[in-house]
């Protein structure tokens, strides 16, 4: 590509923001033209993030000063409630937008307002947003002006689950259970007691049992694939004592004698970022650390009709910034691996 794509990042001081900067620094087709932060305006990116010294000469600007309307695409790595106020103006000016918050993920406005506790500022734009689960919605993403980047838990659960629900029949009346674990970075960079080392280290706990915001997002994704499947879906997240990583264990009660391992292998045979492991393997979170990968395995429980699906991602990469870059590549007709060919870190 002769002319580079001009990229803006709104809210670039959080973990997903710095991941976007890290990944885009290695992208051959883009120029990061603007990074914004109201609290750090005037601070050099390299001073705020020493990991980026020698990579970026930019300084943070306020959104009003950054000239975002001159960009080809803008990423919103902001808390919930920001993109829905600021994205409509950019879209009207022809700028394409990828929102990494939850503002445009849930199509039913009352449901979104119930779970996120605020009035939606751009309800008319929600119906235009494309849900950016890249492997499952590629054609729509390619045409999108606005992409709602999925949450980390929905990505980890939906990538294995959707192909299986499309082709395998579950036993009626049996619950569909997703038991998930996340690293502490999933809570974001803003300080809170629960993410302190003395609280999260050497500890393991469930949370959000009465209801997690990613529950309606997953239910929306699987609704209609089988009768009553969304209503019977149970999701329990846990906080694990690690910085990065996400692990989902999904239990399927099958009734039709199909082979779910074959289904997954066939569906993701040519996938660039979804890896179906050999039979009997179990994926580890460290096997995807820093990479835009989802590794999946599936095994039948002993003396049971239950199949156990295991899925791992890096919550900050495939679960956030990496999938956002993948969606950008699809939107602009670029090679999907551009900026995303990093090998996982070990140890």
From Swiss-Prot:
Gene Ontology cellular-component annotations: cytoplasm
One GO MF term attached to the UniProt entry: NAD binding
Organism: Neisseria meningitidis serogroup C (strain 053442)
Keyword tags: Amino-acid biosynthesis, Arginine biosynthesis, Cytoplasm, NADP, Oxidoreductase
SUPFAM superfamilies: Glyceraldehyde-3-phosphate dehydrogenase-like, C-terminal domain, NAD(P)-binding Rossmann-fold domains
Compartments, as annotated in UniProt: Cytoplasm
Catalyses which reaction(s): N-acetyl-L-glutamate 5-semialdehyde + phosphate + NADP(+) = N-acetyl-L-glutamyl 5-phosphate + NADPH + H(+)
Pfam families (UniProt xref): Semialdhyde_dh (PF01118), Semialdhyde_dhC_1 (PF22698)
Name this protein carries in UniProt: N-acetyl-gamma-glutamyl-phosphate reductase
Pathway given in the UniProt record: Amino-acid biosynthesis; L-arginine biosynthesis; N(2)-acetyl-L-ornithine from L-glutamate: step 3/4
Family annotation (Gene3D superfamilies): Dihydrodipicolinate Reductase, domain 2, NAD(P)-binding Rossmann-like Domain
Gene: argC
Function per UniProt: Catalyzes the NADPH-dependent reduction of N-acetyl-5-glutamyl phosphate to yield N-acetyl-L-glutamate 5-semialdehyde.
């Amino acid at each position: 590509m002769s002319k580079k794509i001009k990229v803006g990042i709104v809210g670039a001081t959080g973990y997903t923001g710095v991941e976007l900067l890290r990944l885009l620094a290695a992208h051959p087709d883009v120029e990061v033209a603007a990074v914004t932060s109201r609290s750090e305006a005037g601070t050099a990116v390299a001073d705020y993030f020493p990991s980026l010294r020698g990579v970026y000469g930019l300084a943070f600007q306020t959104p009003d000063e950054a000239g975002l309307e001159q960009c080809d695409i803008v990423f919103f790595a902001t808390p919930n409630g920001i993109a829905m106020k600021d994205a409509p103006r950019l879209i009207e000016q022809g700028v394409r937008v990828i929102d990494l918050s939850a503002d445009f993920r849930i199509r039913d406005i009352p449901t979104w307002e119930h779970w996120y506790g605020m009035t939606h500022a751009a309800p008319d734009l929600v119906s235009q947003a494309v849900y950016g689960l890249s492997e499952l919605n590629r054609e729509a993403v390619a045409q999108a002006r606005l992409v709602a980047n999925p949450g980390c838990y929905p990505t980890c659960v939906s990538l294995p689950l959707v192909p299986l629900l499309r082709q395998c029949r579950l036993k009626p009346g049996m619950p569909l259970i997703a038991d998930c674990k996340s690293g502490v970075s999933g809570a974001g960079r803003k300080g809170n007691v629960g993410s302190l080392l003395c609280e999260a280290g050497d500890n393991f706990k469930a949370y959000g049992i009465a209801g997690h915001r990613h529950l309606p997002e997953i239910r929306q994704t699987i609704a209609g694939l089988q009768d009553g499947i969304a209503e019977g879906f149970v999701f329990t997240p846990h906080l694990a004592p690690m910085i990065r990583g996400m692990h989902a264990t999904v239990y399927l009660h099958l009734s039709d004698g199909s082979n779910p391992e074959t289904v997954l292998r066939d569906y993701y045979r040519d996938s660039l970022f979804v890896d179906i492991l050999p039979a009997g393997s179990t994926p580890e979170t460290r096997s995807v650390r820093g990479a835009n990968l989802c590794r999946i395995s599936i095994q039948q429980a002993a003396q049971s009709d239950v199949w156990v699906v295991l899925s791992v991602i890096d919550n900050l990469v495939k679960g956030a910034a990496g999938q956002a870059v993948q969606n950008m590549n699809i939107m602009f007709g670029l090679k999907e691996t551009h900026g995303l060919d990093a090998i996982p870190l070990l140890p």
